[in-house]
Amino acid sequence: MFQPLIDYLRERSVLILGFGREGRSTYRLIREFLPEKEISIADKFPVTIEDKNVNLFCGDGYMSVINDFEVVIKSPGISVRDVEIKENVTVTCQTDLFLKFGGCKCIGITGTKGKTTTSTLTYLILKAAGINTALIGNIGVPVFESLGNAEKMIPVIELSSHQLEFTRTSPHIGVLTNVYPEHLDHYNGFKGYVNAKLNIVRNQKENDIFIYNADQGISEFIDESEIKSKKIGISAEDAEKDPFLKELVSCNPRLLGRHNRFDILLAATAARALGIEDKFIRAGIESFDGIPHRMENVGTYKGITFYNDSIATIPEAVMCAVEALKKVGSLIIGGNDRGLDYSDFIKDLSGCNVDNIICLPETGHAIGNSLKEMGSDKNIIIAKDMDCLLYTSP
């Protein structure tokens, strides 16, 4: 599979934009197959590398060199919205190059929330069915690390909006779990964020499959006539119509809550689209043993059970966890302000079954003060930092 990609890069000037985990992975691949090729690396932070054929551009002005190259392989999370990119410059990423040159049928999964769980469940189902697969992408494994075996496998790729932003090739099976406002600071608004997410389906062909959340719908985000692939809308009600699915969504006690049940439905639908038998779907779901930071039971102390749900960075995810766990004594909230509207979240918190709401900077303080102003009967604790909580008794 390497050859088409290597041929593409061989005759073009290449800039690796960002030298984190994915950038280093890109460098290793190019250097392995093109040992003498001149490579340029740009990063805001210092880069140390012993390679006579590498040019480094580091520091605050690292973005200024983008238009000096034919191909820019960008790391996720680096925003180039303030750079006027010339027409002869191709800004791409590992994900796009993998989908374009990989020569395999990929399952790509994205969404504001649920993509990691859905990706993991899908991967476990494929493994249970004896299919050669890999779980790669936003889950923490750069896609280039599976490049060598791509033609012989069906990889499951977790795709963030950052990875999709410059992806112009869509996977054979694309799954969109949901879309809620997030990363608005990066995309300068909700529209830009949604446009990035929709690259998962935008370039699919007639023989491809797009699985989406029918309860939320997609018509407000994209003209459905633009979608060339087969569309499969999944609703929570589907579990009631199918005896197997009805039993499946409750077969694993680690997958609590309606959001996890929906992730199961999406993964099962993707597996069925590949022709996988129900017995393997069930085996895969049953083998799931949880994901760190997602309603993770971290232990019990003095009769109090603690859950780490720190991946819940939007209000909808927080409320799903509160609903799934039933009786929550204390909820700790806070984090950076990314420009989200918290008005509905404040109302939901005021009416939910939580006794104590502990508010950390910076969003937590604003939410806590709003709850106090509206006369909420919750015990609102405004804390300076986590250390202060050790000396605070609700």
Regions found by a protein language model. Name each.
Residues 1-108, 129, 286, 292, ...:
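Short, basic phosphate-binding NTP loop
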Residues 13, 37-38, 132, 172-173, ...:
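Residues at the starts of beta-strands that form the adenosine-phosphate
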Residues 20, 45, 139, 216, ...:
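Residues in the short beta-alpha loop(s) of Rossmann-like NAD(P)-binding domains
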Residues 28-32, 63-69, 76-214, 218-228, ...:
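Phosphate-binding loop of NTP-binding sites
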Residues 40-44, 211-213, 332-333, 355-362:
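Short internal beta-strands
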Residues 43, 59-60, 92-97, 228-241, ...:
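Beta-strand->loop->alpha-helix junctions that form or flank phosphate-binding loops
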Residues 391-394:
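Conserved small/polar residues in nucleotide/adenosyl-binding loops
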